[in-house]
Amino acid sequence: MFARAAAIASVPVMREGTALDAIDSRIIHCKGALARLKELERVVRLLTDSMAGNSAERTIIPLMSYVLALCQGPLFGVSPTLRKRYELLSQMRLVKLTEVNAAASLGAVDLWSRWPADEDDASAVRSKFYDETLHGRILEHLLHTTRNCHALYQRRHKLLLAERDACRTAETQEWNDLYSLAVDDFLVPSEITLGLELAVLITDRDTDTTDMAYQKLNIQVLGMLLEYFNGVAMPTINQYYLELQRAVRNKGINQNNILTSLPFWAHTLHRIFAMLLRAKYLLDIIQSVLRLAYLPNKTHFSHPTVQLASPNLYLFRNVLEKLDEICCGTTVLSARVTEYISPFLQQGVTHRLTYDKVVHLYKEAVRPTVSSLTEAIDLMSNLLKSWEASCSAEHISRLQTLSEDDVSTLSAVEDKFLIDKSLYEEGQKRKQENKKSPAANSTSKKQAVTLQRRPSNRIVSTNASPLRQQVIANGEKRISTAPPMRRRSLSLQRVSPSPDPDANRRSNSLQFSSTNQILLQSSVREALSRYQSRHANIERPLSTPPGTFPYHAFASSMVDEESRRIASLSLAEGNGPAAIKVMANMASEYEDTSRESSLSGCCNYQTYANQVLAQPQLAGSFPTVPLVKKVRFTGVPPPTEDEDPKPKRKGWYKKPAVLHYPTPSQSMIQKNKQRHEGYVFRTSLREQQREKHKQPGRRFAAFLDHVKDTNTLSGHKAGKIKSKLTR
């Protein structure tokens, strides 16, 4: 008993997660079957009422073969007799109307699907397809079989609910509250409702029952079913599949947080089982529909004229080979998913909700099932495209000039096959390359565009000025611009101020720098304007070649003159010394640069000016900035040295006390954790007290004295309080 409890405790079970046992699985299957049978009974009644108003001029015939195909799956598996009757009805054969009174049991239901040998004679199938009397009797027998099966499932459902309540009394109420919300999106029998649209209106039997009309009717049915699968059935399955995929791939996150992010995470196993059961129903329905469409028209699809009309003959022949395996062979599309969900229905099987269990079900059951379902829908889509092309008006007009035994027709078919094969292989190869390196392809495209655009920035025009040519020859220094949302000041090297910079200034230090920066911007702007005006007034001699124009002396004189003007600027009263010092340093720097190289000095001067002028906030606020001293708040002086002391050493800080002691080793920490002790209590209180009192013989003397003193004090206080109350 203790070993079993320890084993259960070692399994990382999700908090408040619901385990999935055989009773839950059978309840899910039983509830889905009851909903389908109820909807089927309603559809059969409506189809019977629609046939009641038939006349010689207007006849409505339900397509019972396709209606019965929508009932394929483990729906009638509750009784072998009812299962056999359903198979006979699918062959358009009548059955007995005696009621089956099988004893209700809690055993597993047969989930395997079996298809009888359908007729492949097109004329015989077409004659039954338009038989009004036969379809009316099939509806009557199907209604009786449906009611009988519904009664058996109701008795089975009651027994399962009673068994569940007896086994899990504590979780019954929670299960009843969340059960319908957790799995109902996979149990809605919406495909049964399509039976109301599966009917044909006959107004003229000579034109409405021809071979071409029969093929067009099958094409319409396939198109409607394909639209339903892609638009209604698959989105629900794909959505939950993607949610499971994200949960499985997020390995670095906490496993509990991953599972709790799923919808109805406490019933994750129930939802997975319901989704797999829903996928099995869809796979069985698709296989039944493909058998009805392929077997009677197998000869038609192999006709050379039909193959010439296909968009891709190589793909069409591959589709025909797969259809031959599915419809004429022993291949069952739902065989794999049936093997996965059958163990869930076995008695005594319980699956606990763990992260590893969800990952295992996703990899072994969910992913292969969704892949098989997608491939089956694609197979139906490819068949529909080729079939529509063979029945188009353009192809019908071509049939008058083509013959089946004509040598030119057969050679054209082979030529089309070779061409379509090469095109198909090239397309598949291109898709594989795109899947392998999508990032590399996108990067190469971006790099190609960049390489095409880069040389345009370095193009040297013959009409450019000599100064520009010299700058390009020496190598222009590029200035990287910041994004427009975050403008940077190149002089202050910090983020641009807020829309109201005056309110955010803390002390007088930033006021000086901001004022100096504003004056520097204005002076540089004026200097550049004068420089540009002088440069525009100077006329270059016609006899001087472009490469020998004396710009060096002109640039040197301009830099010297403007530097002296900037150095002579002064601020308002009270701020003058700081501003004059900054401006003088700038002037001396520009003078030294101009004396070394006049041309490079001019370029550096323009570059620095552009950097300074790249601050629209300061430049725009220059006329409105008052030159007054700011404080933090009204009536509060600037911070003193006691409040904000300056560091005495550069890069020096006081070492925290915790850094003086070495950290304990990991093994010691783990050892103390296992003993449920902290690192501080590595010495017991007994040893401390014994060393303190130096009495090895008395172990608990000091400890008992301490307890005695504590009790005495507490008793003394209690006596005082009692005496006050008794006064």
Curated annotation (Swiss-Prot):
Domain of life (superkingdom): Eukaryota
Biased composition (Basic and acidic residues): 427-436
Biased composition (Polar residues): 439-472
InterPro entries associated with the record: GIP4 (IPR026241)
Stretches the record annotates as Disordered: 427-514
UniProtKB keywords: Cytoplasm
Subcellular location, record wording: Cytoplasm
Functional description taken from the UniProt entry: GLC7 phosphatase-regulatory protein involved in GLC7 subcellular redistribution and chromosome segregation.
Subunit structure: Interacts with GLC7.
Protein name, per record: GLC7-interacting protein 4
Protein species of origin: Eremothecium gossypii (strain ATCC 10895 / CBS 109.51 / FGSC 9923 / NRRL Y-1056) (Yeast)
